[in-house]
Every structure is written in C-alpha cells, then in structure tokens.
Amino acid sequence: MTMSFAANRARGEIRVRYEKHGGITRPLRLFETGGLRLRHPRAFQGCVGMIVNSAGGIAGGDHLRLAIEAEEQSELVIATPAAEKIYRARDKAAMLDLSLVLAPETKLAFLPQETILFDGAALSRRLDVTMANDASLLLVETLVLGRLAHGESAISCDFRDSWRIRRGGRLVFAEESRIEGPLNRTFDQPSLGHGRRAMAFLLAVAPDAEARLESLRARLAPFEPACPHGVSAWNGMLVARLMAASPEVLRCALLAGLGLWRDDIARLWL
C-alpha cells in the first residue's frame, strides 16, 4: 500500500496597534498566531518591535500576514533580528502579506534584514500602506538571489512583489516586480545586474523626504563603483535603488544611507 502525506504548511499572523501616551509609544493591542512573534527589546531607544519567525524560514505553501497600525503621533521602528530565508518550493508559492496603517503625524520605519531566495524558491509578496498626509514612512527591502556565501549564484526562482502606497486617500506609489526562471541569464547581462546578486530598495514618504535627496546621494557616493545606485525624489517621496555583488557591501551602503534618519541601525541589524 502506498501512502502520501501533504507537506505541512505554516500559517502565521501578527496584528498590532501602537499608541503614544505620555510621550511614549507602546503596543496597545497585539495578536500573534502560528510561528510569528513580535518582541519589544528594551535595549533600544524608543519603541522598537522585532518580528521573529520561529520556523527559521519560509517554505512553499506557507502564508504569513503582518498588520501594523500606528495611532496619531506614534513613533516606532519595526525590524527583524536576522535575514529571512525563502526555501525551495515543491509546488505552491509562499505568500507574505504586509499591511501598514499610519495615522496623522505618525513616524514608522520598517527595516527588515535581507530576504534570501534559495534555489527553487517561490514567493508572492504584497505590501499595502495607508497613511495620512503628514505621516512619515521609511522602508527598506533587501533581496539576495542565492546563498552567495555557498557559491550559489546560478539559481532559478519565482519571486513576485506588489507594492501599493496611499497617502491622504490617493495612490502615490505602485510597483509590480517579478523575477523568474534561471537568474544567470538575466542578471549577468551588463544592462541589468552585470553579475550582481544583491539589491536593495529604500523608500521614504514624508513631508521632508525631497529635502534629503542631496544628503542621501552624498552618503551613498563613496560606495561606487562596488555598489552602483540611483536616487530620486518627487511628490514627497525619496527613492533609492542599489545593487552589489556582495550582500556585505550592500549592507554597508544601506547603513550609511539610513544613518540620515537613524544612527542605531547597525545595532538593530546585529
């Protein structure tokens, strides 16, 4: 007799609401389920939430949800204590849904460490942001294609990313990205990756975002040519895209750039 067993699929969810009371931002309500946990270490200045995935990574068919709501005048940072690993998918893609809601005068920095795509990984990720006109958002996403420390560069994967940001009820930023198939055919081309397998996206949406354009360019300039990048600003947004052959070089450039907003990012990412 032949028996088959369905693979275990992880389901995890975090729903949290923050408030500012007496000059201090703290979680007002917190719901956790599955392998996702949110911790608030006291070693950092201000309110810092660390998202912990106790599974140690994300596999095909997993579905994780994060919903973060910040009430008026809240100031907080959300980060992760380690890189997130996306393992090979046997059939279904993993799904990750992230929702951020920023009330008036809120300041939220969402600064996860790298997402590492293993060979055969499949991930569909969606980000939805709803924010007030005078709220401030700082967001970083770093993607590493393959386990480069193991020499794994010629990988194949299926990665889909969908971003929507609404400010004051209006859609101000939308992006759809897809990376699929054997990556060496794409990212080895000089016009695209030129062999680089680590990339990052930095986005600031804030009343003072455009004013930081030249300062951010100056902070990133010393990392050329090892970390080519582009920085632009418009409509209350500041956007930077970076690439490097090494995740370590990319991280150094990001730390320099993020230092424009916070000087303790290196401690967050230890």
From Swiss-Prot:
InterPro entries: UreD. Keywords: Chaperone, Cytoplasm, Nickel insertion. It comes from the Bacteria. Its main location: cytoplasm. It is found in: Cytoplasm. One of its GO terms (cellular component) is cytoplasm. GO terms for molecular function: nickel cation binding. Required for maturation of urease via the functional incorporation of the urease nickel metallocenter. Belongs to the UreD family. UreD, UreF and UreG form a complex that acts as a GTP-hydrolysis-dependent molecular chaperone, activating the urease apoprotein by helping to assemble the nickel containing metallocenter of UreC. The UreE protein probably delivers the nickel. This is Urease accessory protein UreD. The lineage of its organism: Bacteria, Pseudomonadati, Pseudomonadota, Alphaproteobacteria, Hyphomicrobiales.
